[in-house]
């Protein structure tokens, strides 16, 4: 169990402040090294000038302490000072999954997307079994372990919440294009809220497109509330029926009708080895959605 030490991080770790690994609303992540062992780690430096900000970091530490899964980033140590808190976490160097979506030279096959989606669902299932909602799932919050392997870890539990069935939880934060309809409506959130985001991520991995993104936030939120999306774009040509059904079962406006992480992992798209074998041999691993020149 990690608790925030009121000691100087420099006594234990060398933090390379010149190298920024990532950042967000919280601050920045730097590469660091444990002085005693030489172990490479990542230091997330969070500005905490108010009691509320400090409590938010303590919540993040508390949540990360409860999670132990190969597809979730692990907390290693924590430090607290007057103006900031520093979380020391395991280091991975494969970059954001988002980078692979937008990289024109990196074409994902449907089988690649299945591999990524399965791991996302496995990480989410573990969180949900521990009664934790992530509430900020998006490609920027999924890191690849290295440049070559298709292994991922979910990061950033800064907005995560413990789910207590008797306490009806409402939230009003997140990134517009990944918000579930119940967040937009300021309605109660629960496990299906994360599964909507998994649906958006899967859609993006398959196509490079964002299903609800409008010209501005208002249009994006209206698209979400109307549940206005389809798989008719050229990028989805060649997508298996199982893949289409999988996305459809997640991007469902009524949250009680969405499949859970456990159900997603049993869905044929993620679980049927015969389908995976067919996709492996089919059309020499064409990118998901790419048109086969032999197709009439």
Predicted regions and their residues:
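Glycine-rich ATP phosphate-binding loop
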Residues: 28-49
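Conserved N-lobe beta3->alphaC-helix segment of eukaryotic protein kinase catalytic domains
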Residues: 45-68
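A short, aromatic-enriched beta-strand patch in the conserved N-lobe beta-sheet
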Residues: 77-78
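Conserved short submotifs of the Hanks-type protein kinase catalytic core
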Residues: 83-96
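Activation segment signature within eukaryotic-like protein kinase domains
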Residues: 116-117
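Catalytic-loop of the protein kinase fold
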Residues: 128-144
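Regulatory extensions flanking the kinase catalytic core
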Residues: 259-294
